[in-house]
Structure formats: C-alpha cells, structure tokens
C-alpha cells in the first residue's frame, strides 16, 4: 500500500480493502467503473432478491454510482481511462501509479463528462442497471460539483472551447441522457446527486445532498437556510449531517431531509404527517415576524398553512410572533404539542402568540376546524365534522408515539382512555389524518 499510494491516499485506500465474506479472500472492494454483478455474492439473481426484500420492507432501494470515477483495474477504466480521463492544466499526482498528466482523485481515473463516449456509457449503464435489477433510483456521487477544466488532446469536448470549463453544463447533458435512457424502463426512477448544482441540472433530479450546515460556519449568519429548497421544491435537498447538535432544529425549521438524522422522533413524525405542505409549491421563505431575530417559513397545502420558526434572539421569545387575521372555521395549533394557540394584539396588529426557547425551532399550523374532543370520565369523545373513507383518528403521546387508531367517520368516536394506561397530568394529542397527511389536530391533558 505504501509503495503504491501517497500518505494522503493510503488511509483512504486501506478502507477499501476488505475480506470478502463469501470467499474469505482479501480484495479491493471499490472497483468503480463497471457496475457488474458480483458472482461470489450470487450474481444478479441474489442482487434482485435483495432489492425485492428491501422493497417488501417498505423502503426504497437505490444504487450508489461514482459517475466520475473509473479504476484502472476495471474494464471501463482500461477501455476509456486514457482516452477520456480528465487531463488538467497541471497535476499533483496523489499516487505513483497514476498516469502522468491525469487527474487522479481517489487514486483512479477521473473521467471527463464533456464528451459523447463517456456520457453515453454512463447513461446506458444506468439503463442496464434499472432493467436488470428493478432498482428504484441512483445517486451519482461527485455530481453537482465542478471538476477542473480538461485539456486532454485525446478526445473532443461537446461544450468547452480550449481553456474553458463547461463541466457543469456537461453534467446536465449526462443527466438528460440518463433520463432519456432510463425513463422508458421506469418513468418513476429516482435521480440524485451529491449536490443539486444549479437549476438546469436540478430539473432532471428528484433530490440531492447539500452541505450547507457542514460547510458554512454559523458565525456568519443567525440560522442556515437554502433558498434553492424554496424556489425549486421539486428537487429535494438532503442536508449532510456530521453530528451537528443543532441539526434537528435546523431540519425542522427548513423542512429538510437529512442524511443520518439525529432528530427527535416527534420532529420526524411532524415532517412526515405534513408532507403534503412541505412538498408543496405554495411555499414562502422568511415570512415577516414581529420579533427581531425570529425567522419563519410558510408551507401550504389542502387548506392548511404550516409555519416553522427558529429563534435566534438570544433569549426565549413569548407573545405575539406571527402577524395574522382571524379566519372563520380555522384555528391555530402547535404541531409539536397539540396546544391550541391564541391570538393576541401587538400594537394595531393581530398575531399568533407562542413561546420559543432560544436556539430552538417551532412548528405551528392554521388548520380547518374538523375535530373537537371532550373528556367524560375515562372516555374521550371525539367529534368529527367531516371524514373521507381514508381518514383516521389517532391518539399520540408527547413523543409522537401512536397509542390508538380508528377509522374516522363523521360524527362521534369514543376513545377508552383507561385501557390505554395514560400518565396523569401529561399532554396528549388527537389527530385527524386523511391518508398519510394531517387534516386537523387538538390536544388534551389526562
């Protein structure tokens, strides 16, 4: 290892060498480029079964593909590496085995995306994977970031003129080709990248990683947020989480997806149950609030409006925060507690009153009044104003755990509290869900 790779790469490459659990032999596990099926693991039939098992579990299986990289040990690397690898203006080889003049991040060929041959190869490879395995999506690693300009004399560039860098434009072209190749196989095939790049690229993607919190220090701003998430909501962003203790609050405030989430289950449930609003195009970042350094976003859908907050004021904020007007048949609810929120006056304005601790997020909603509850001894009587066949009544504890569920019908439903063994003086929530999404919500204390 030390003979072949520099100190910078030695540690990285050593993690790619592992014992094959089937054969017992040590092998290099990161053979980027071919994306064939490992015979020692059972080949394509075993992979198809594994993918089917993942789907049966209720999860969406996707592949990782390093669309920029090709190991010299692979057929792809041997066939395309020298002719279509990136040759930057200057190089600092990271390993003594890298061909002179080639970009060799990760100790392998870094392929130029700005040529027809490699872009066609990636598109047709993904078409094959989708057809062979029934995988439901792919994330192209390293895509969404620009690579150095390529000065190789061994291939013709589609977009770049000599000395120019059209790397991002070339990536867009690859995504277009992938869509054209894969959509006939599976029009619901999910496309993702390591970053969303820019709007022309994101139009072909369903989601992308983001490094906003990880790469941008909090010292330069009160709270992180990404305008891209609001202006192009069809391309979801998944913030890369490296264990930042503030990530749960940032996630709730921005309604982000997060890689390796460390948020409370209640936050996760709140995001899922209001996915219709968070997935909507009717969104507005940084709506006006009545308190300095208290920030808010709006997400609306199906007659409800969700407002998330982040308090960067340096102290707990209490009282009127969000300007509003009374609306017949609507009420304000704290989605984390089920507490009914009151309207108050701030000067000449009507505002929603709530309390938000410093450096914490909050999530409230203006909902249609469809649900009322009343406790009679050991029974909770829920009165439902309207319900469809796919509507459910759910009782949850303060952590969001579901304790009771019943099909909701218009009229009254009795919930036997004694049988649920609820804790005294503890707040609980009752929710009305249509399908997966919240329609109305209220709270009560046992």
Predicted regions and their residues:
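Aromatic- and carboxylate-lined catalytic core of secreted/periplasmic carbohydrate-active enzymes
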Residues: 246-308, 357-366
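Carbohydrate-binding surface patches
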Residues: 290-327, 388-392
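Active-site-adjacent "subsite" loops/lids of carbohydrate-active enzymes
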Residues: 38-39, 46-52, 61-133
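Catalytic domains of carbohydrate-active enzymes, especially glycoside hydrolases
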Residues: 1-25, 132-136
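C-terminal beta-strand-rich structural cap/linker in extracellular carbohydrate-active enzymes
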Residues: 344-376, 419-424
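Glycan-recognition surfaces
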Residues: 76-108, 112, 168-269, 290
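Short, aromatic- and glycine-rich surface loops/edge beta-strands on solvent-exposed regions
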Residues: 362-365, 393, 423-436
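Edge beta-strands of extracellular beta-sandwich domains
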Residues: 367-377, 405, 436-446
